[in-house]
């Protein structure tokens, strides 16, 4: 493992398999190769593979196999991340290499920055998020030569709106049981590779990273009159699995190019600065020379045709992962009040919270006049995810479930004690019975992503996390549910964008999933049972 990226850092990391199960690609062989006839593979004295002809003994060097991020998505040998692949193809070294090639290939560099990454960097440098925003813009635009820099807030809000619309549509068509979020790539890959029975439950709404990428490349290409493949998009995210998400292939035949070319985490950005001190730095002098307002700063580094610039840097209420569970209920309340104002009045709604077995699982219930209208749950960490997936696993109607007699006696004993003491059963969150579940692989959610900056050796863990949470909470909030006109405006702008820039709504907002076939090579079957 590299010093930068280790198993301890990634909450959702599992070591690669002993044998990679990627199938060998058969290339069209030339006439010269065909004349080789039957061959065998041997290792020479230097450990290099050779192809030896059985006809005349002629030898030929073999090229090393190349594994890409796309191969990782199509492989079930590792549950989520293969660290070597992530570092090789989405690293700070790759970004530096791309910047060096800029003079010859005339690439246009653009960047987007997540809220969690901004909070992590602000904590590490002990400053306000607004100040770290100024330093990041200075670093990317003035020092590295990026043309545009935006926040991911606009992409997130479009994602939240589309999530609500998707849930309403599926429920109106009779969908039973919980719909599961797809914003976390670690969770999605886990489901695709080990629990395909839940794929039909997973929402097809794209994440803020991917929506922002599509918007940024399309608007930049139009404004600068260049092709999309001339644009290099860097996304700064809190999680290493976001690198794999960026490599997920698109289904639209006209827009197959990836919307994100490189994903770096705050941890990797700091490493880049340490290794390139003579070229790049978060120059604190930039703060003293930056006298304009934040609004002016955000406007200056965004494309001229980028809408709602300040919105891109604003946050949302709810969890530290984007507030999907909370905003589903709040936007649903807004939807009901707009659709049927005679039946639903805002003042009669309330939101109830129900705790789970631990701090990483809880339930939210939307109640109207003491009647539950809808519910959502927040589930963080793979232990809680496993428990949820087990509950959602379909059971055969012909199979009878045997009850463990010891468990039955224990339950009866506890029930008897409660009855004797007059105690009432305490409600506990049950995500499997909710309408919608926000799922994140990392404990505490995205704010605790594996790519966030580690605490100093002399710092208390709880205090460090608390500082990061405080900085995340300091980002200005713009709640969609508090302004119905804003939500309607964003929906209208999204439709106009898709028409004006010839981008299908499904390409902008929707993703897709598929079951990854299990390996048949026994040497490659090793990690699934550990989850």
Predicted regions and their residues:
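Iron-sulfur-associated redox domains of electron-transfer enzymes in respiratory
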Residues: 2-531
């Amino acid at each position: 493992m590299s010093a930068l990226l280790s198993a301890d850092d990634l909450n959702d990391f599992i070591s690669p398999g002993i044998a990679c199960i990627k199938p060998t690609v058969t290339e069209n062989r030339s006439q010269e190769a065909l004349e080789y006839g039957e061959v065998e593979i041997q290792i020479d004295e230097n450990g290099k593979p050779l192809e030896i002809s059985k006809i005349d003994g002629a030898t030929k060097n073999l090229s090393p196999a190349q594994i890409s991020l796309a191969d990782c998505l199509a492989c079930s040998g590792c549950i989520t991340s293969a660290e070597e692949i992530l570092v090789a193809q989405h690293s700070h070294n790759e970004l530096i290499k791309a910047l060096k090639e800029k003079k010859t290939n005339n690439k246009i560099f653009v960047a987007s920055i997540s809220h969690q990454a901004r909070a992590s960097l602000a904590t590490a440098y002990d400053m306000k998020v607004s100040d770290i925003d100024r330093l990041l813009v200075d670093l990317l635009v003035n020092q590295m030569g990026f043309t545009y820099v935006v926040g991911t807030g606009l992409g997130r809000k479009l994602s939240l709106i589309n999530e609500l619309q998707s849930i309403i549509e599926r429920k109106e068509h009779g969908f039973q049981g919980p719909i599961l979020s797809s914003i976390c790539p670690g969770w999605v890959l886990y489901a695709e590779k080990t629990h395909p029975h839940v794929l039909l439950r997973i929402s097809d709404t794209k994440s803020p990273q991917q929506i922002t990428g599509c918007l940024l490349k399309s608007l930049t290409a139009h404004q600068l009159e260049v092709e999309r493949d001339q644009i290099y998009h860097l996304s700064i995210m809190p999680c290493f699995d976001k690198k794999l998400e960026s490599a997920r292939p698109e289904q639209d035949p006209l827009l197959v190019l990836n919307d994100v070319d490189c994903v770096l985490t705050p941890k990797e950005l700091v490493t880049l600065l340490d290794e390139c001190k003579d070229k790049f730095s978060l120059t604190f002098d930039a703060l003293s020379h930056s006298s304009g307002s934040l609004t002016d700063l955000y406007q200056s580094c965004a494309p001229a045709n980028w809408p709602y610039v300040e919105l891109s840097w604003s946050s949302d209420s709810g969890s530290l992962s984007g507030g999907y569970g909370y905003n589903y209920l709040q936007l649903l309340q807004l939807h009901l009040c707009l659709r049927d104002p005679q039946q639903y009045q805002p003042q009669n709604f309330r939101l109830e919270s129900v705790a789970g077995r631990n701090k990483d699982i809880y339930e939210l219930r939307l109640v109207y006049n003491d009647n539950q209208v809808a519910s959502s749950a927040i589930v963080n960490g793979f232990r809680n995810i496993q428990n949820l997936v087990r509950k959602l696993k379909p059971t055969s109607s012909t199979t009878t479930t045997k009850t463990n007699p010891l468990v039955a006696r224990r339950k009866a004993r506890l029930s008897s004690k409660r009855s004797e003491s007059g105690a009432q059963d305490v409600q506990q969150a049950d995500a499997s019975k909710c309408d919608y579940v926000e799922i994140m692989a990392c404990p505490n959610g995205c704010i605790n992503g594996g790519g966030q900056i580690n605490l100093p050796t002399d710092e208390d863990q709880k205090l460090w996390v608390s500082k990061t949470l405080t900085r995340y909470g300091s980002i200005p909030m713009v709640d969609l549910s508090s302004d119905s006109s804003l939500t309607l405006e964003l929906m209208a702008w999204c439709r106009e964008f898709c028409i004006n820039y010839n981008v299908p709504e499904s390409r902008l907002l929707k993703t897709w999933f598929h079951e990854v076939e299990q390996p048949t090579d026994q040497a490659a079957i090793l990690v699934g049972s550990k989850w």
